Design a protein with these regions (language model features):
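Extracytoplasmic gating/loop element in the C-terminal half of outer-membrane beta-barrel translocons
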Residues: 290, 299, 474, 585, ...
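Short Gly/aromatic-enriched secondary-structure transition segments
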Residues: 252-254, 466-468, 527-530, 770, ...
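Acidic, glycine-rich flexible loop segments
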Residues: 274-297, 310-314, 382-418
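Short, small/polar-rich motifs associated with maturation and membrane association
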Residues: 1-350, 355-358, 362-370, 432-435, ...
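Extracellular/periplasmic, surface-exposed regions of secreted and cell-surface proteins
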Residues: 129, 177-178, 346, 352-361, ...
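Switch/connector loops and helix/strand junctions flanking conserved nucleotide-binding motifs
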Residues: 114-115, 212-214, 232-233, 247-249, ...
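Conserved small-residue
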Residues: 237-291, 726, 745-847, 887-890, ...
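Glycine-rich, aromatic-lined ligand/substrate-binding cores of catalytic
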Residues: 847-880
């Protein structure tokens, strides 16, 4: 008690002494022109004492002693530290922060001031990327910029990167929709760059900014700049985190006794005897006999079989002298999936070196390498996790897992536990090396020539091993096998660039010209063997050659390019830019090999006009205004090599006399006149800054049209060969990009809010000489990939409701609880009382989103910082494209709880039920025909990221030699709002070989230190 009293007296006396020595300091904060600045933060250095200037710019703050220092900060102005001395009145004038005006962004073959851009370019800095604890660099771009759709396709650690689409899907050909990615000017994969090595990412969205990349820029361009060395003593950094993943959404299946009751009900509806007795159902519920009457959750067992632990470590050093600067980094990443034996490992190294050889010559060298090792368990077909996930979706809880006798289930050919516990696996290993060297020659003040050479080399190896194992005493995989593939690819880039920059009074000119040559090559081999001695030997030469096969391939293509840029600026307010690239690709016939891709753009910085200065006197909150317009053309040559050549097959044999002789047959008739896909982009936009650019807003409207899409048209089978590609299609994307940013400081609290929104309308405008290609989801006037099917009007309430209704297309479904198909038209153009495929199918599904959006809130108070991001998509409706693995009881499949609880039943014959009547179909399907009944709104809003960090005070860490130590916790994909099917993630495109490996919800604890 005495100790507490003594401590109280000490604290009281200390505070009394401090208060006795304090005094008030008042003053006014203005800019250099004398204009008052409200909301300025004034803090007493080394304390938490602070004040904020009022609307008249005035402030009052209490200080103690004559050695006090005020720290004055205001967004858009240079921060100041002002000594108080013995003053009680202290006016402060802040200077505009020119760094904001001088902010540069990376563009094609150089940089430009952001305020002088005439095209549509979005950028994100390393500081923004570091706020995301992501596994792949592509995922860090989600929600950062408008105009780019970033969608993660699944949670498999071996393939959990994101697909990137800039301003809509521009083609439906094999040329693809992926943007061109350049890392330090050389083509590379974005996900093979460690996120910690990235300095900035720029997205070139319109033709004005991307035309200088010509025939590879139709889908947009992503420019990645890696970190460089710095002048000064070495700065060491270490970043690390440990994380735990779990599934975002998993469909819940019904219990075994509920499944038994459903089966009994559907049997009764069909007039058949029950499959399960009441005693059987009681045993399912009690769990007394888990072998014969189990309640085994196959999905839960599968997605909980892995530990889901991920770790990441990055170390780096940056430093250098005035002459030479260097950067070196090492990184390691490991992720264990939520499924056992499923993991990914990445090792990476990077060295960046910049040196000045003399006052005219500079040399830059960038080298990087990475090693990726991915593995996953495999099903009986050797295709990886697809069969295993499918089996878990399909098998009811009434089917046991591994039984005491070592076997699985009851005569089930798809048994995930058997596959998971077998020695089967799928492994993929990749090694990549990048070298990028350049020499910069400053010939004289305004003229620079750069020579650059870049080389990339990669090796990929895959092994798919299927073990010998038994599922039941009478069924299993009796023959083990191994399929192994090996491939290598390389690319060599040589380019020379000349730049001339000249300012004559109010006129600024910039000229760039260059020549580039690229060579791409690859080769691969593959082999298959089976009948290995046991499940422990899986080297290809240990298998039998009796059924063995071998494959081999090689390819090569080249691209020759000439490009240029012209910039003109008058008084930094009238801006003009022209770009052009002339490409020649070996992928096209000689007569159509070359293509010219030009662009023109202009901008008017209205804020630099004298009348704008006068306008600001009445509206001082108006700080910047610019309007922009551009037009240009881009190309797409990312098709297979030499598609203008006929393809031959050497397999056929022909009779000559009494013997068969080997021969050749044409299998593909090529079009000798094919050429580039050409994309024309028109863009108008404006940029607005308010309140000294604390609030900024920009918007763009664009029309992006792709013509001459390479497309294989349908022909009669009488031809006897597959037709080659022809330039026969067109697609249009129209849309808006919106960006809003606000930043402010209130007292000691700094915060920022950013919002992005992209609206887009995609449609096919031409399809050879037809209006639709149903099999490919192509319809003139509708988005790429549109679903074509029947319309419906709920369900039949009873069998009696079928009477008098138009004849249904599927007779066995025309009953109570069946989907009620609509009669829309007939031969005369009016409903004819019969629903059929010819007249009554229309567009029912839109797989492409019409909007993408994100809202980010970040800030800091004292040593704490935070970042929250909401992200989502809208305007898309879709179904779950997994057939029997989604539709209840079809082909003996499982039943989801959502369907169980919301289905039509005889006891509750709701014609508006979410699911139709359940029927047991041992082979085939009942209600899974393509109809709008199954299409749901796939829009969603997701808490994509949340991160909270704390930076330890320097006085605590200074003795350790560290200059900074930050601790943080972070989460990804934390929760989702959606009206899509329960348990199914709307961000994913399920179906095909991707199956359903749910996205990962990631919880992370990390540390970042610098010394």
């Amino acid at each position: 008690m005495k100790s507490i009293l003594l401590l109280f007296l000490v604290l009281f006396s200390t505070s009394y002494y401090a208060s006795a020595q304090s005094r008030a300091v008042t003053g006014k904060v203005t800019d250099t022109k004398g204009e008052t600045l409200p909301g300025v933060s004034i803090k007493l250095k080394g304390t938490s004492i602070g004040a904020t200037s009022g609307t008249d710019g005035r402030y009052t703050i209490n200080v103690s002693g004559n050695n006090s220092i005020l720290v004055v900060t205001y967004i858009g102005f240079v921060s100041q530290e002002v000594a108080v001395n013995n003053q009680t009145s202290l006016d402060i004038a802040l200077t505009i922060d020119m760094q904001g005006l001088e902010e540069v962004v990376v563009v094609g073959f150089g940089t430009q001031k952001k305020v002088n851009l005439t095209g549509s370019v979005a950028s994100v800095s390393s500081e923004q990327l570091e706020k995301r604890a992501v596994t792949k660099s592509s995922l860090a771009l989600q929600g950062q910029m408008s105009g780019i759709q970033v969608r993660q396709g699944g949670g498999n650690p071996a393939s959990n990167g994101a697909s990137l689409v800039i301003r809509g899907q521009g083609t439906f050909s094999g040329a693809g929709t992926s943007p061109l990615v350049l890392v330090d000017g050389i083509e590379a994969s974005l996900d093979l760059v460690d996120p910690n090595d990235i300095q900035s990412v720029s997205i070139l969205k319109d033709a004005a900014s991307a035309a200088i990349f010509g025939s590879k820029a139709a889908n947009g361009v992503i420019l990645v700049t890696t970190k460089k060395g710095i002048i000064g003593k070495p700065v060491f950094t270490y970043n690390s985190y440990i994380g735990k993943t779990e599934a975002t959404m998993v469909p819940e299946m019904i219990n075994s006794w509920e499944y038994a009751e459903v089966i009994n009900q559907v049997f009764a509806d069909a007039g058949a005897a029950k499959r399960y007795s009441d005693a059987d159902i009681a045993k399912f519920k009690s769990g007394e006999d888990p072998v014969n009457f189990p309640n085994f959750d196959h999905i839960g067992n599968l997605f909980d079989s892995g530990n889901g632990i991920s770790t990441r470590h990055d170390i780096g050093v940056r430093g250098g002298s005035e002459q030479t600067q260097y950067m070196f980094s090492l990184g390691y990443y490991n992720e264990n999936g939520i499924i056992t034996k499923n993991d990914a490992n990445r090792y990476n190294i990077r060295v960046n070196l910049d040196t000045r050889l003399n006052n005219k010559l500079k040399f830059s060298l960038k080298m990087a390498g990475n090693l990726n090792k991915n593995s996953q368990p495999s099903g009986i077909n050797g295709a990886g996790l697809g069969t295993i996930v499918g089996g878990a979706m399909r098998n009811a809880n009434s089917i046991p897992g591994r039984m005491p006798d070592g076997f699985y289930g009851r005569n089930e050919t798809l048994h995930p536990e058997a596959d998971l516990e077998s020695a089967s696996f799928l492994q993929n290993n990749g090694t990549n090396f990048y070298t990028n060297g350049s020499v910069i020659w400053d010939i004289f003040k305004d003229l620079t020539i750069t020579g650059q050479i870049g080389h990339t080399y990669g090796i990929e190896q895959s092994k798919a091993y299927v073990a010998k194992y038994a599922i039941t005493p009478t069924y299993g995989n009796a023959l083990n096998s191994l399929r192994e593939n090996w491939s290598e690819g390389s690319a060599l880039t040589l380019q020379t660039i000349a730049e001339y920059n000249k300012k004559i009074k109010d006129h600024t000119f910039y000229l760039l010209g260059g020549v580039s040559g690229q060579t791409f090559g690859g080769k691969g081999i593959g082999a298959f063997r089976d009948a290995f001695p046991n499940n422990s030997i899986y080297e290809i030469n240990a298998g039998s050659t009796a059924r063995g096969t071998q494959t081999g391939s090689s390819s090569r293509n080249t691209l020759q390019s000439y490009f240029g840029r012209f910039n003109y600026s008058f008084r930094n307010k009238y801006l003009f830019e022209a770009n052009a690239r002339y490409d020649g690709s070996s992928r096209f016939p000689q007569d159509s090999r070359w293509g010219l891709f030009p662009s023109l753009s202009a901008a008017w910085r209205i804020s630099q006009e004298s009348f704008f200065m006068d306008l600001k006197k009445g509206m001082p909150w108006l700080s910047d205004l610019k309007i922009r317009a551009s037009w240009g053309q881009l190309g797409n040559q990312s098709v297979g090599n030499y598609p203008y050549q006929d393809l031959l097959s050497l397999a056929p044999v022909y009779p000559f006399g009494s013997a068969l002789s080997a021969g050749a047959a044409i299998t593909t008739l090529a079009n000798k006149d094919i050429t580039w896909e050409t994309t024309t982009v028109k863009n108008v936009g404006f940029d607005l800054g308010l309140f000294n650019d604390k609030l900024s807003f920009s918007t763009d409207y664009f029309i992006k049209t792709t013509d001459d899409i390479l497309y294989s048209v349908s022909v009669s089978n009488v031809l006897g060969a597959t037709p080659g590609l022809t330039n026969a299609g067109s697609v249009e994307n129209r849309g808006w990009d919106f960006n809003l940013n606000y930043r402010n400081v209130v007292g000691g609290f700094s915060y920022g809010v950013s919002a992005i929104l992209s609206l887009i309308d995609n449609k096919v405008t031409k399809l050879s000489k037809v209006n639709q290609d149903i099999a490919r989801g192509l319809f003139v006037g509708y988005p790429i990939g549109s679903a074509f099917g029947y319309k419906s009007n709920g369900l039949f309430g009873s069998n009696a409701d079928v009477t008098g209704y138009p004849t249904q297309p599927f007779a066995d479904q025309a009953q109570g609880g069946g989907i009620k198909y609509l009669d829309l038209s007939g031969p005369s153009g009016a409903p004819d009382g019969v629903v059929n495929a010819t007249y009554d199918r229309v567009i029912i599904g839109k797989p492409l989103p019409t909007s993408t959006y994100a809202l980010t809130l970040n800030g800091g108070f004292k040593n704490f910082d935070f970042n929250f991001m909401l992200q989502g998509e809208g305007g898309r409706n879709d179904q779950v494209n997994l057939g029997q693995f989604f539709f209840p009881l079809e082909n003996n499949s499982n039943v989801q709880r959502d369907a169980y609880e919301n289905r039509w039943t005889a006891a509750n014959p709701n014609p508006n039920a979410a699911y139709p009547k359940l029927r047991n179909i041992a082979s085939g399907f009942f209600n899974s025909n393509r109809v709008d009944f199954w299409y749901r709104d796939a829009s969603f809003l997701r808490l994509k990221n949340a991160q909270i960090g704390y930076t330890l005070p320097k006085k605590i860490i200074s003795r350790s030699g560290m200059s900074s130590l930050r601790l943080y916790v972070s989460g990804e994909n934390l929760f989702t709002l959606s009206d899509f099917y329960k348990g199914w993630d709307p961000e994913m495109q399920t179906g095909g070989t991707a199956w359903y490996y749910p996205l990962s919800k990631l919880y992370v604890a990390g540390v970042s230190l610098k010394f």
